[in-house]
Each structure stands twice: as structure tokens, then as C-alpha cells.
Regions:
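"…together with the soluble PPM/PP2C metallo-phosphatase catalytic core" -> "…together
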Residues: 1-184
Length: 184
């Protein structure tokens, strides 16, 4: 089911991004490069930013057709919250015409709030406290430790993607890998 949503969102993104990127370029929604950065980054000045809008919209709309219950909707909402953090981070960069949006502390705080809300929801309303140990097939009941565990997984996954992401559309490959992880 989630694989269908992933395939549809990939197709929509592949069709929509070639329209969105030139539009963002015309709006001058481009990346600002620091003067004290590496010399080879100078040529990347003005590279369109906020391309994640198309990806987040495509994933959200495609996923909405496959929601089975409120739990799926809450999981999707968590992803949208993380996407909004990225959107506003990029938006601040564009408005300030500087490469600094949120500070690392601000971004991490917002991500922590989103992951905490999702983890608490899973613990209190779904009653989920077990996790599957990869390659062993065993389930471990973490009890209340499920909350920080879920937070750690969400924060580690999203920030790994953020750290890997660059300026030249690397997020699409990283994003697809992360999406496959969440579909599993």
C-alpha cells in the first residue's frame, strides 16, 4: 500500500519538479553562498532552493489516498511537520538573502517537538511499545523507553538526510531512500 503511494509521489514529483524549479528560479528563490565558503561553491550562488515543496506535496497528496486509519494520518502529519521545518528554514534564507535560516538549535528543537508528539501519540493512543530487532525477527518491549527510541529514530533519520543533502538536488536520492525506510 505505501509502496503505491511512494510510486505515485515519485511520478508526480518527477513531473512537477521540472516546472517548480524554473518557477522558483524566476522568483529568485536561490541559495546564498557565504563569502568565506569554499571557492568552488561560488558558482552555486542562486541555485534554486525550496524544491522540497514539490516532494512534500506529492508525498502528502499521494499518501492521503492510501490512509487506512487515523494512525496513518498521524504518521503522515509527523512527516509534514518535519517538511514544514525545512520549508520555513529555506523561506527564512530566501527572505533574509543569507544562507542561515533557523539556527541548528532552533531546527533541532522544532524537530524534537514533532518527534516527541508522534512518539507520545504512538505510546499513549496506539499502545505501541515494541520494536522489531532487524535480522533477528525478535520483538523487544521497550515500555516507556519506546518514546525516546522513536524520537531518536526520527531525529537520526531526518538529520542524516539533512547532512547528506547538498545544494544540487541531492535531496531527491536521499529522500527516496528515507521514504523507502519509512515505508518498510
Amino acid at each position: 500500500m505505501w509502496l503505491k503511494a511512494l510510486i505515485i509521489s515519485f511520478a508526480v514529483t518527477a513531473a512537477f519538479e521540472p516546472i517548480l524549479i524554473p518557477f522558483l528560479h524566476r522568483l529568485k528563490f536561490g541559495q546564498t553562498i557565504l563569502e568565506d565558503g569554499p571557492v568552488w561553491h561560488k558558482k552555486k550562488q542562486g541555485t534554486p532552493t525550496m524544491g522540497g515543496i514539490g516532494f512534500i506535496l506529492a508525498v502528502t497528496v499521494a499518501s492521503m489516498f492510501f490512509l487506512r486509519d487515523v494512525h496513518d494520518a498521524i504518521m503522515l502529519l509527523c512527516g509534514v511537520l518535519f517538511g514544514l521545518v525545512g520549508f520555513f528554514d529555506d523561506y527564512i534564507k530566501v527572505i533574509k538573502k543569507h544562507n542561515q535560516g533557523f539556527t541548528a538549535k532552533q531546527k533541532f528543537t522544532l524537530q524534537t517537538i514533532a518527534s516527541l508528539l508522534y512518539a507520545i501519540y504512538m505510546y499513549l493512543f496506539v499502545g505501541q511499545t515494541k520494536t522489531l530487532v532487524p535480522f533477528l525477527g525478535a520483538r523487544i518491549d521497550l515500555g516507556i523507553l519506546y518514546v525516546p527510541f522513536v524520537m531518536l529514530v526520527l531525529l537520526a533519520t531526518t538529520n542524516s538526510a539533512n547532512l547528506t543533502d547538498g545544494l544540487d538536488g541531492l535531496a531527491s536520492g536521499v529522500g527516496a531512500t528515507v521514504a523507502l525506510f519509512f515505508c518498510a
